Amino acid sequence: MKYNINVHSEIGQLQTVLVHTPGNEIRRISPRRLDDLLFSAVIEPDTAIQEHQTFCQLLQEQNIEVVQLTDLTATTFDKANATAQNQFIETWLDQAEPKLTPEHRKVAKQYLLEQKAKSTLSMVRSMMGGIDKRKVAAANTINGDFLVDPMPNLYFTRDPFASIGHGISINRMKYLTRRRETLFASFIFANHPIIAARKFYFKPIDMGTIEGGDIFVYDQQTVVMGLSERTTEAAINVLAKKIQQDSSTSFKRIFVINVPQLPNLMHLDTWLTMLDRNKFLYSPNMLAVLKAWRIDFTDPALKWNEIAGDLSTILHTIIGQKPMLIPIAGADANQTEIDIETHFDGTNYLTIAPSVVVGYARNKLTHQTLEAAGVKVIAFKGNQLSLGMGSARCMSMPLVRKPL
């Protein structure tokens, strides 16, 4: 691994990608806490893990370097100095949910250090998987089953940070249960000796909330963002200002697209994705609330200028040519078919090269529609993973794409 962040498109050949094959954290999703943990159902963990391993294998078979978040965090920790190592642990304790009392903080830290004595990887997995109170002293003083809650959404590596050109956005997630996830990216990019980002376009201390599923890099000059339940106007303004101030960037503008405010379909990439220079997959359900704006970096005020027109007109404005629009489930789909395939993230394919995508096999109508439009679909079974409300794009963060 010797590279800098380099993502200047959604469709350039994917060379290196960050993923997280889930562990104990998904074994700890209680039916009592589905809303709290942002899941639609309790998933079968062994099957979900196997599904994710298949996903990773498919990517590797396409000559894509697959980097695991656990491995990268552990490697970074081992290469960091003692001060950075201690700060990483202390920050994790600061952010723990539920909030730790001074006594419970000591217990949690001791547990992590015991895991570290086994291996750094064991410690990292414990940070992600949470701490079962039965594993520690003073269990009878702890309410609930966990001294520290798990992070079951971590396998959606798209959201905690985003690669934008040669820079990154380390995001402030909307919900508390996910906000802790950005700790790992913050630590990696501050301490890894090789992996580097030239600029930081957003940090968790910045105003508003922002998540990677709402961030798209269409080309070297254009970023597209979703204004959604998870990504706010304030956060988009912060990111726009920081890109504008970066004299080394090639980006000229941001386009913002309004996203329906539905809890199970929370990001722009659950409604609209780019498959090739002019090919887009979309859910017709987004059209009722469609709005878009343009922010030019030549404008010191970064004013939001509304774009009039339908989806085809808006995308034509963004890419400079007439788009080929591919509806979820096909042009002849009825509302039930559209709703089902939208619900199971039928737009959320990961584009690994122009007109080559990876996604769930369960979206059969969309799969057929894509192939009829000249898009190669590499499908894998993800019936359990999909219950976390995300598909292949959600489960991946590109680090390096080949320039177009």
Swiss-Prot record:
Highest taxon in the source lineage: Bacteria
GO molecular function: arginine deiminase activity
Uppermost EC category: hydrolase
GO aspect biological process, one term: arginine catabolic process to ornithine
Pfam family, one: ADI
Enzyme Commission number, as recorded: 3.5.3.6
Compartment(s) where it occurs, according to its Swiss-Prot or TrEMBL record: Cytoplasm
GO CC, alphabetical: cytoplasm
Keywords in alphabetical order: Arginine metabolism, Cytoplasm, Hydrolase
Gene3D superfamilies named in the record: Arginine deiminase, L-arginine/glycine Amidinotransferase, Chain A
Family per record: Belongs to the arginine deiminase family.
PANTHER family xrefs: ARGININE DEIMINASE
Protein name per Swiss-Prot or TrEMBL: Putative arginine deiminase
Organism per entry: Mycoplasma pneumoniae (strain ATCC 29342 / M129 / Subtype 1)
